[in-house]
Amino acid sequence: MGLVGWGLLLGCLGCGILLRARAQFPRVCMTLDGVLNKECCPPLGPEATNICGFLEGRGQCAEVQTDTRPWSGPYILRNQDDREQWPRKFFNRTCKCTGNFAGYNCGGCKFGWTGPDCNRKKPAILRRNIHSLTAQEREQFLGALDLAKKSIHPDYVITTQHWLGLLGPNGTQPQIANCSVYDFFVWLHYYSVRDTLLGPGRPYKAIDFSHQGPAFVTWHRYHLLWLERELQRLTGNESFALPYWNFATGKNECDVCTDELLGAARQDDPTLISRNSRFSTWEIVCDSLDDYNRRVTLCNGTYEGLLRRNKVGRNNEKLPTLKNVQDCLSLQKFDSPPFFQNSTFSFRNALEGFDKADGTLDSQVMNLHNLAHSFLNGTNALPHSAANDPVFVVLHSFTDAIFDEWLKRNNPSTDAWPQELAPIGHNRMYNMVPFFPPVTNEELFLTAEQLGYNYAVDLSEEEAPVWSTTLSVVIGILGAFVLLLGLLAFLQYRRLRKGYAPLMETGLSSKRYTEEA
């Protein structure tokens, strides 16, 4: 069997229903004792007493802090979902790292920092338009995605049951599974949007921790940063950066859906990916939401069929335009009450695509991010499965670029983000679900540069060409001249009807020239 064949085999095994102890929780913490004690504070290195790197001054084991402020929105239950007060249903003590140290055992650095002591600012990586990549850069990106699909995550596992069933039927076996790096990226997104499980066939659907609220921008930002760092590790290239797809073309075509990039449509079945693309063999995970709800279980990483896109019968739908992006960026308010999908004149809601790009609400309209997903259709059209499609990565990279442009233009204070009464998961200090160790929305409400990356993109107003400006001026002058001629003709007509009257009386008069004669 060749190298690729072994890679595919490992990829298939990587997300099976394997009850084995980075992704949702560190593998080292998902033991019977770890789950029962609700503590995830592993040692750093071989010294067992070096808990959270404490002996090196990197961190210590501490009580998890969660947001206790009230939320609003359609989720009205309490203590029914294991994502409430994340992650305390699973762990109430974790490593709290000091300074720029980060990670489940404080063994890494925060985004944007490097060095043994994490005290050296890392040169910012540059996210560029995917169409501007060289052939070598393009191959590195596509190859890294494929490698991530086939590589079991070395540190993290996923849970295959909700919190009440986490230890299995006999209460002694943690219900977990190994998963590939990319499939875990998919699983994170699924877990953030999945329904609350109340019983067989009784899902509570009014909940979403990564959409329909302020956390939409920060959640997806962290999601991409997580994947970018994993791809850097897989490729051994610390300067590796995710590209973006500028979907604001206003066209009726997906210009990244080619065999040179993320896969064209298959000729004999246009809902599938062309056999000339490496993505034609990608199988998807976490797609059978109704089945999970019926069985009161979670996505366990089993493959559920091939990746699909579906443009059939959608020939009149067009992608957003640059004007839509510019209108969205002109909105100065980050978000507005009720901080939900019906917020108006909210930059976040316009970017997410529930508002028109200018911030007005129209329930019949999809725009920007939502429109791009709808345009691709297929696997990409549903939140729980969308991240299976690699187009998701470059689509959200551009969405993040728009968010970053807004941050740079407006320089908002943290007070721009609601402390309370946003939907569950969307308050400023809520720990984003299901990232671990815990990270709040506020921690990602920063410019990209502060997090170690930048975008090579120009989202400013396009300057009109000289001939266009000149033509506009000439048309304006001609229009004013025609209007003046019409006004003079009207005045002459009235004067002839009333008879001659002097323009100015010789006597004093209180009548003003704006009044009727």
Curated annotation (Swiss-Prot):
Claim: Endoplasmic reticulum is one of the keywords in the record: no
E.C. designation(s) = 5.3.3.12
Q: What happens when the gene is disrupted?
A: Mutant mice show hypopigmentation of the coat and have the retinal pigmented epithelium significantly less pigmented than wild-type retinas.
Enzyme class, spelled out:
isomerase
Q: Which residues form the signal peptide?
A: 1-23
UniProt PTM comment: Glycosylated.
Tell me the route in metabolism or biology where this protein functions. Answer: Pigment biosynthesis; melanin biosynthesis
**Binding positions (Zn(2+) A):** H189, H211, H220
Q: Which Gene Ontology cellular-component terms appear in the entry?
A: cytoplasm; cytosol; melanosome; melanosome membrane; plasma membrane
This one is known as L-dopachrome tautomerase
* Organism per entry: Mus musculus
